């Protein structure tokens, strides 16, 4: 059950304030709760970042910190609900920040897919990260521009124009996520069908990333609906909706990757075509010998990494295995 539904009604129901930029006077208690939650998640992800030293995962603590900043701006808006700057800061941070988590989802699944034989992926794993992160960046820019337009507008028409831009940005993000989920579902079905040795090591992590991504998808659906009915529509001017369908889902998405930290499961040394750290594992070497090298140039690997086993002739090459 979303966090907001567990709070007493007098805590998460806003006082109606038609002259407020929010359409109500924001409550302190729920905003404070989310500041605390995202603050804790920021600390936890920062510790894991230093411990596992996968520096690209810096996006997770940065995202948690940005969410925290968005709710701090909301707290300030409790007593300054007619000031534009804290309102714009809140909207931009809360609308745009999940894009950072999306980049982690796309990159994580792309890297995991690279560790498996190429035949499991309908899109070459080397293209997963740049393709979906590019879509992610486009949605980031569009959402940021739309949020700034709506937040700094002086008329209802200008605010609605900003809302429309935000809807377009969130729709781009949602579209990218849905395509990504289809790619992942295809990969997951094929891997589950064959059950290669590596699946046991990465199965729970892949499911965790998928669940985390679905939380962001549900949050994005809420944002599209919110902006579709207007900046001053019933969803945007109803406070508990924000905490239930945005804050709670984003907290859950970030928390899941605390329980299943990216740095713990993905190898530190990584190459999109060939991963020496993983391929050095005996079990993985055996899997590669039996199933083919994922995303590697066969001739290059045949000359530099001959595949032999005690029970087979030592002259057997990867190219020969692929032919059979």
Regions found by a protein language model. Give the residues of each.
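Membrane-proximal first intracellular loop
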Residues: 2-98, 123-126
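Transmembrane alpha-helix entry/boundary detector in multi-pass membrane proteins
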Residues: 26, 87-94, 132, 158-175
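Helix-loop boundary elements of multi-pass alpha-helical membrane proteins
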Residues: 40-62, 105-135, 184-212, 264-271
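Cytoplasm-facing ends of alpha-helical transmembrane segments in multi-pass membrane proteins
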Residues: 40-46, 95-119, 137-151, 175-191, ...
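Helix-to-loop junction signature of class
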Residues: 70-78, 143-153, 217-230
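Extracellular loop 3-seventh transmembrane helix
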Residues: 94-98, 163-174, 203-261
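Non-transmembrane, juxtamembrane loop and terminal tail segments
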Residues: 271-304
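Conserved small/polar residues in nucleotide/adenosyl-binding loops
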Residues: 318-324
